[in-house]
Protein backbone atom coordinates (compact mmCIF):
# COMPACT_ATOMS: atom_id res chain seq x y z
CA UNK A 1 0.00 0.00 0.00
CA UNK A 2 1.25 3.50 -0.87
CA UNK A 3 0.21 6.95 0.31
CA UNK A 4 0.49 9.44 -2.53
CA UNK A 5 0.14 13.19 -2.91
CA UNK A 6 -0.80 15.23 -5.98
CA UNK A 7 0.43 18.77 -6.61
CA UNK A 8 -1.94 20.63 -8.93
CA UNK A 9 -2.89 24.05 -10.27
CA UNK A 10 -6.43 25.42 -9.91
CA UNK A 11 -7.11 28.59 -11.91
CA UNK A 12 -9.35 30.42 -14.40
CA UNK A 13 -12.81 28.78 -14.66
CA UNK A 14 -11.73 25.99 -12.32
CA UNK A 15 -11.30 28.48 -9.48
CA UNK A 16 -15.09 28.53 -9.20
CA UNK A 17 -15.41 24.74 -8.80
CA UNK A 18 -16.64 23.94 -5.29
CA UNK A 19 -14.74 21.66 -2.95
CA UNK A 20 -17.22 18.78 -3.38
CA UNK A 21 -17.27 19.11 -7.17
CA UNK A 22 -13.47 19.14 -7.19
CA UNK A 23 -13.40 15.88 -5.25
CA UNK A 24 -15.88 14.37 -7.72
CA UNK A 25 -13.71 15.54 -10.63
CA UNK A 26 -10.71 13.66 -9.26
CA UNK A 27 -12.80 10.62 -8.37
CA UNK A 28 -13.89 10.41 -12.01
CA UNK A 29 -10.31 10.91 -13.21
CA UNK A 30 -8.60 8.25 -11.11
CA UNK A 31 -9.70 5.25 -13.25
CA UNK A 32 -7.40 6.60 -16.00
CA UNK A 33 -4.40 5.95 -13.74
CA UNK A 34 -5.10 2.19 -13.56
CA UNK A 35 -4.30 2.37 -9.85
CA UNK A 36 -6.35 0.54 -7.25
CA UNK A 37 -7.48 3.46 -5.09
CA UNK A 38 -8.41 2.63 -1.50
CA UNK A 39 -12.21 2.95 -1.11
CA UNK A 40 -14.56 3.56 1.78
CA UNK A 41 -16.59 0.71 3.26
CA UNK A 42 -20.38 0.33 3.06
CA UNK A 43 -23.10 0.19 0.43
CA UNK A 44 -21.74 3.04 -1.70
CA UNK A 45 -17.93 2.81 -1.62
CA UNK A 46 -16.03 5.78 -3.04
CA UNK A 47 -12.34 6.64 -3.40
CA UNK A 48 -10.83 7.97 -0.17
CA UNK A 49 -9.16 11.22 -1.18
CA UNK A 50 -8.62 14.45 0.71
CA UNK A 51 -7.57 17.92 -0.37
CA UNK A 52 -5.02 19.53 1.91
CA UNK A 53 -6.17 23.02 2.97
CA UNK A 54 -9.11 23.36 0.52
CA UNK A 55 -9.03 26.57 -1.52
CA UNK A 56 -11.95 29.00 -1.09
CA UNK A 57 -14.16 29.30 -4.17
CA UNK A 58 -13.04 32.13 -6.46
CA UNK A 59 -9.36 31.93 -5.54
CA UNK A 60 -6.67 30.40 -7.74
CA UNK A 61 -3.58 28.45 -6.74
CA UNK A 62 -0.28 27.07 -7.98
CA UNK A 63 0.18 24.65 -5.08
CA UNK A 64 -2.94 22.62 -4.31
CA UNK A 65 -2.36 19.23 -2.70
CA UNK A 66 -4.51 16.09 -2.73
CA UNK A 67 -3.76 12.95 -0.70
CA UNK A 68 -4.91 9.41 -1.52
CA UNK A 69 -3.93 5.79 -0.94
CA UNK A 70 -3.49 2.91 -3.35
CA UNK A 71 -3.32 -0.80 -2.58
CA UNK A 72 -0.17 -1.41 -4.64
CA UNK A 73 3.38 -0.15 -4.12
CA UNK A 74 4.24 2.81 -6.36
CA UNK A 75 6.19 6.06 -6.25
CA UNK A 76 3.59 7.89 -8.37
CA UNK A 77 5.65 8.36 -11.52
CA UNK A 78 3.54 8.82 -14.64
CA UNK A 79 0.31 9.44 -12.72
CA UNK A 80 0.18 13.20 -13.37
CA UNK A 81 0.31 12.71 -17.14
CA UNK A 82 -2.53 10.17 -17.07
CA UNK A 83 -4.74 12.39 -14.94
CA UNK A 84 -4.17 15.42 -17.17
CA UNK A 85 -5.56 13.69 -20.26
CA UNK A 86 -9.13 14.40 -19.15
CA UNK A 87 -8.91 17.29 -16.69
CA UNK A 88 -11.24 20.28 -17.24
CA UNK A 89 -9.76 23.63 -18.22
CA UNK A 90 -8.02 25.33 -15.31
CA UNK A 91 -7.00 22.12 -13.52
CA UNK A 92 -3.54 20.70 -14.17
CA UNK A 93 -1.64 18.11 -12.16
CA UNK A 94 2.05 18.99 -11.86
CA UNK A 95 3.36 16.00 -9.92
CA UNK A 96 2.49 12.85 -7.99
CA UNK A 97 4.83 11.59 -5.28
CA UNK A 98 4.86 9.70 -1.96
CA UNK A 99 3.11 11.64 0.83
CA UNK A 100 5.94 11.51 3.36
CA UNK A 101 5.28 14.73 5.26
CA UNK A 102 2.28 14.88 7.63
CA UNK A 103 -0.24 17.66 7.04
CA UNK A 104 0.34 18.90 10.58
CA UNK A 105 3.73 20.23 9.35
CA UNK A 106 1.89 22.77 7.18
CA UNK A 107 2.02 26.14 8.96
CA UNK A 108 1.76 29.09 6.53
CA UNK A 109 0.70 30.00 3.02
CA UNK A 110 2.07 32.64 0.68
CA UNK A 111 -0.40 34.36 -1.63
CA UNK A 112 -0.42 37.13 -4.20
CA UNK A 113 -3.10 39.70 -3.43
CA UNK A 114 -4.51 42.30 -5.84
CA UNK A 115 -6.82 45.04 -4.58
CA UNK A 116 -8.49 46.66 -7.61
CA UNK A 117 -9.96 50.18 -7.71
CA UNK A 118 -12.20 51.15 -10.63
CA UNK A 119 -11.50 54.88 -10.24
CA UNK A 120 -7.79 54.59 -9.57
CA UNK A 121 -5.81 53.74 -6.46
CA UNK A 122 -6.22 56.32 -3.67
CA UNK A 123 -3.06 58.23 -2.80
CA UNK A 124 -0.91 56.50 -0.21
CA UNK A 125 -2.96 53.30 -0.33
CA UNK A 126 -0.04 50.86 -0.37
CA UNK A 127 1.60 52.50 2.63
CA UNK A 128 -1.68 52.71 4.54
CA UNK A 129 -2.47 49.04 3.90
CA UNK A 130 1.00 47.99 4.98
CA UNK A 131 0.54 49.92 8.22
CA UNK A 132 -2.90 48.37 8.73
CA UNK A 133 -1.73 44.79 8.35
CA UNK A 134 1.29 45.26 10.60
CA UNK A 135 -0.72 46.60 13.54
CA UNK A 136 -0.20 44.71 16.81
CA UNK A 137 -3.96 44.05 16.90
CA UNK A 138 -6.47 43.93 14.04
CA UNK A 139 -9.97 42.85 15.00
CA UNK A 140 -12.62 41.88 12.47
CA UNK A 141 -15.95 40.09 12.70
CA UNK A 142 -15.81 36.53 11.44
CA UNK A 143 -18.42 33.80 11.26
CA UNK A 144 -17.82 30.84 13.56
CA UNK A 145 -18.62 27.21 12.78
CA UNK A 146 -22.00 27.85 14.41
CA UNK A 147 -22.59 30.68 11.89
CA UNK A 148 -22.45 33.31 14.63
CA UNK A 149 -20.43 36.50 14.26
CA UNK A 150 -17.49 36.82 16.63
CA UNK A 151 -14.67 39.35 17.04
CA UNK A 152 -11.36 37.83 15.94
CA UNK A 153 -7.91 39.40 16.13
CA UNK A 154 -6.22 38.42 12.87
CA UNK A 155 -2.95 40.27 13.53
CA UNK A 156 -1.18 37.22 15.02
CA UNK A 157 -2.10 35.24 11.87
CA UNK A 158 -0.35 37.70 9.51
CA UNK A 159 3.37 36.96 9.15
CA UNK A 160 4.45 39.18 6.25
CA UNK A 161 2.96 41.81 3.92
CA UNK A 162 4.49 43.60 0.92
CA UNK A 163 2.41 45.99 -1.22
CA UNK A 164 3.08 48.06 -4.35
CA UNK A 165 1.04 51.02 -5.61
CA UNK A 166 -0.22 50.81 -9.20
CA UNK A 167 -2.54 52.92 -11.34
CA UNK A 168 -5.66 50.82 -10.76
CA UNK A 169 -4.56 48.25 -8.20
CA UNK A 170 -2.47 47.67 -5.12
CA UNK A 171 -0.59 44.42 -5.63
CA UNK A 172 1.40 42.49 -3.11
CA UNK A 173 2.34 39.31 -1.34
CA UNK A 174 1.18 38.11 2.05
CA UNK A 175 2.22 35.23 4.27
CA UNK A 176 -0.53 34.15 6.65
CA UNK A 177 -1.18 31.31 9.04
CA UNK A 178 -2.55 28.26 7.22
CA UNK A 179 -4.22 26.30 10.03
CA UNK A 180 -4.89 26.03 13.76
CA UNK A 181 -6.27 28.63 13.19
CA UNK A 182 -5.88 29.64 9.56
CA UNK A 183 -6.55 32.98 7.89
CA UNK A 184 -8.28 33.19 4.53
CA UNK A 185 -6.47 36.05 2.69
CA UNK A 186 -9.88 37.20 1.42
CA UNK A 187 -10.57 38.42 4.97
CA UNK A 188 -7.94 41.12 4.47
CA UNK A 189 -10.52 42.94 2.37
CA UNK A 190 -12.93 42.73 5.29
CA UNK A 191 -10.30 44.28 7.56
CA UNK A 192 -9.86 47.16 5.10
CA UNK A 193 -13.61 47.78 5.01
CA UNK A 194 -13.78 47.79 8.81
CA UNK A 195 -10.72 49.92 9.58
CA UNK A 196 -9.95 51.92 6.40
CA UNK A 197 -13.30 52.11 4.58
CA UNK A 198 -12.07 54.76 2.12
CA UNK A 199 -9.56 52.20 0.81
CA UNK A 200 -12.03 49.33 0.37
CA UNK A 201 -11.25 47.81 -3.05
CA UNK A 202 -13.88 47.25 -5.71
CA UNK A 203 -12.54 43.76 -6.33
CA UNK A 204 -9.97 41.48 -4.71
CA UNK A 205 -8.00 38.71 -6.42
CA UNK A 206 -6.14 36.02 -4.49
CA UNK A 207 -3.65 33.51 -5.90
CA UNK A 208 -2.05 31.02 -3.55
CA UNK A 209 1.62 30.61 -4.46
CA UNK A 210 3.21 28.35 -1.87
CA UNK A 211 2.45 26.29 1.22
CA UNK A 212 5.13 26.58 3.91
CA UNK A 213 6.19 24.75 7.04
CA UNK A 214 6.97 26.43 10.37
CA UNK A 215 10.53 27.19 9.22
CA UNK A 216 9.32 28.93 6.07
CA UNK A 217 10.36 26.08 3.78
CA UNK A 218 8.10 24.88 0.98
CA UNK A 219 5.72 22.15 2.13
CA UNK A 220 5.21 19.27 -0.27
Go through each PLM region and give its residues:
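Ordered, amphipathic secondary-structure segments that act as subunit-interaction surfaces
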Residues: 62-114
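Short amphipathic alpha-helices in soluble, non-transmembrane regions
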Residues: 78-87, 123-135, 188-189
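Extended, well-folded interaction surfaces typified by the phenylalanyl-tRNA synthetase beta subunit core
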Residues: 2, 7-9, 13, 17, ...
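Short, charge-patterned binding micro-sites
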Residues: 37-70, 100-102
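Core RNA-modification/binding signature centered on pseudouridine synthases
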Residues: 134-220
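Short Lys/Arg-rich amphipathic alpha-helical segments
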Residues: 13-15, 23, 27-32, 36-41, ...
Amino acid sequence: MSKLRLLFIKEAQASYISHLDLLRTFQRAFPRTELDIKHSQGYHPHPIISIVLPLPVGQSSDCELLDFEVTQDTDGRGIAEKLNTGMPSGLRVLDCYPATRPVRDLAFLRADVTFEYDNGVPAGAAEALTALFTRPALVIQKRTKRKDLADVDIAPMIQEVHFLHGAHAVTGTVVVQAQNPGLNPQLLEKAIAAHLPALTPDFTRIRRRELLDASGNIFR
